[in-house]
């Protein structure tokens, strides 16, 4: 089966609850059947209907399961003239959280300042007091 190609103008005609298409990563999805099932409510989908919803989709941070479910609604892709640049998406999946930094520069700066302060006290302030 050859994938259908749609213009953004064609997609924009499908923006109602009873006829809802969205574009995500330059792929066109007919999510009409999913509107009532969407855990975030139908309003958020209708708001993004008929346009490129890539940014909104990625900002929410959908699960792998949601991404897999999306594929069953795929009906084609966006034509070259309508395409947007691909977003650089860094998806954080469960169990793959980025490593937390082990410390900060304060761990070096504060002890260094304490040592400098002690040396100034011992070699500058104390000798002046004994003069």
Curated annotation (Swiss-Prot):
Does the record's keyword annotation contain tRNA-binding?
Answer: no
The membrane topology term of the UniProt record is:
Single-pass membrane protein
Protein name (Swiss-Prot/TrEMBL): Cytochrome b5
User: Which PROSITE patterns has this protein been placed in?
Assistant: CYTOCHROME_B5_1, CYTOCHROME_B5_2
Q: Which PANTHER family match?
A: CYTOCHROME B5 (PTHR19359)
Annotated SUPFAM superfamilies = Cytochrome b5-like heme/steroid binding domain
- TM ranges: 108-125
Q: Entry's InterPro entries?
A: Cyt_B5-like_heme/steroid-bd, Cyt_B5-like_heme/steroid_sf, Cyt_B5_heme-BS, Cytochrome_b5
So what does this one do?
Answer: Membrane bound hemoprotein which function as an electron carrier for several membrane bound oxygenases.
Which parts of the sequence belong to the Cytochrome b5 heme-binding domain?
Answer: 3-79
Family membership noted in the UniProt record: Belongs to the cytochrome b5 family.
List the Gene Ontology MF annotations in alphabetical order. Answer: heme binding; metal ion binding
Q: Which organism is it from?
A: Rhizopus stolonifer (Rhizopus nigricans)
Q: Which UniProt keywords apply?
A: Electron transport, Endoplasmic reticulum, Heme, Iron, Membrane, Metal-binding, Microsome, Transmembrane, Transmembrane helix, Transport
The cellular location(s) given in this protein's UniProt record come to: Endoplasmic reticulum membrane; Microsome membrane
Is Endoplasmic reticulum found in the keyword set? Answer: yes
Pfam families found in the cross-reference section: Cyt-b5 (PF00173)
List of residues binding heme:
38, 62
Q: Name one GO cellular component term.
A: endoplasmic reticulum membrane
């Amino acid at each position: 089966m050859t994938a259908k190609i749609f213009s953004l103008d064609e997609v924009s005609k499908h923006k109602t609850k009873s006829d809802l298409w969205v574009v995500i990563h330059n792929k066109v999805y007919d999510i009409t059947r999913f509107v009532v099932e969407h855990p975030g409510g139908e309003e958020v989908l209708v708001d993004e209907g008929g346009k490129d919803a890539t940014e909104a989709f990625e900002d929410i941070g959908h699960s792998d399961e949601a991404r897999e479910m999306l594929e069953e609604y795929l009906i084609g892709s966006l034509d070259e003239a309508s395409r947007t640049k691909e977003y650089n998406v860094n998806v954080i999946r469960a169990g793959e959280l980025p490593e937390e930094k082990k410390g900060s520069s304060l761990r070096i700066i504060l002890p260094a300042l304490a040592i400098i302060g002690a040396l100034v006290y011992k070699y500058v302030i104390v000798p002046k007091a004994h003069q």
